[in-house]
């Protein structure tokens, strides 16, 4: 698990306060499903995922993306205990949903891309480094049940 400096924590929480969770969540999950189409198999119940425009406009994708980012927002308040914060979600994704833990890394990388798009010049290399550390640590926490 990554160790977060006080600067990392400040950088993460400062940017997070400006994130529109609904928009960024839908875009992040939508992009994951478009860019990595094999991840769609976990979302059979979401209806039409036949094209990029269908995925990006799908209300179930948007709603679940918001749920995912809301959970990530909670994590920004518990950076020193991500494993504990995500224990139940790790169990759900491992035992019940059988999600490949590699997908958590992919989702984190897509989120970093979405943040870069949304925040432009404000998303400096230093901000990116803190967020990359965050999404890597979250992916590790979500994967903890698999080991």
Swiss-Prot record:
Induction: By 5-azacytidine. One of its GO terms (molecular function) is heme binding. Changing residue 23 to G: In Kuala Lumpur. The modification S-nitrosocysteine is found at residue 94. Pfam families: Globin. The modification N-acetylglycine is found at residue 2. The modification N6-acetyllysine is found at residues 60, 83. GO terms for cellular component: cytosol; haptoglobin-hemoglobin complex; hemoglobin complex. The keyword S-adenosyl-L-methionine does not apply. The modification Phosphoserine is found at residues 45, 51, 53, 140. Changing residue 3 to Q: In Macedonia-I. The modification Phosphothreonine is found at residue 13. Changing residue 122 to K: In Siena/Hull. CDD domains: Hb-beta-like (cd08925). Heterotetramer of two alpha chains and two gamma chains in fetal hemoglobin (Hb F). In the case of deletions affecting one or more of the alpha chains, the excess gamma chains form homotetramers that exhibit neither Bohr effect nor heme-heme cooperativity (hemoglobin Bart's). Belongs to the globin family. This is Hemoglobin subunit gamma-1. It comes from Homo sapiens (Human). The lineage of its organism: Eukaryota, Metazoa, Chordata, Craniata, Vertebrata. The gene is HBG1.
């Amino acid at each position: 698990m990554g160790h977060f400096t006080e600067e990392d924590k400040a950088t993460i929480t400062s940017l997070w306060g400006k994130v529109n969770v609904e928009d960024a969540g839908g875009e992040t999950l939508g992009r994951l499903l478009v860019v990595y189409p094999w991840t769609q198999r976990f979302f059979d119940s979401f209806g039409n995922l036949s094209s990029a425009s269908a995925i990006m406009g799908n209300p179930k994708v948007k709603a679940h993306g918001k749920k995912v980012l809301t959970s990530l927002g909670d994590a920004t308040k518990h950076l020193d205990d991500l494993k504990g914060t995500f224990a139940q979600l790790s169990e759900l994704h491992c035992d019940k949903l059988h999600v490949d833990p590699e997908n958590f890394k992919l989702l984190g990388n897509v989120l970093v891309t979405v943040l870069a798009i949304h925040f432009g010049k404000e998303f400096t290399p230093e901000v990116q480094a803190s967020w990359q550390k965050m999404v890597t640590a979250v992916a590790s926490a979500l994967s903890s049940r698999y080991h």
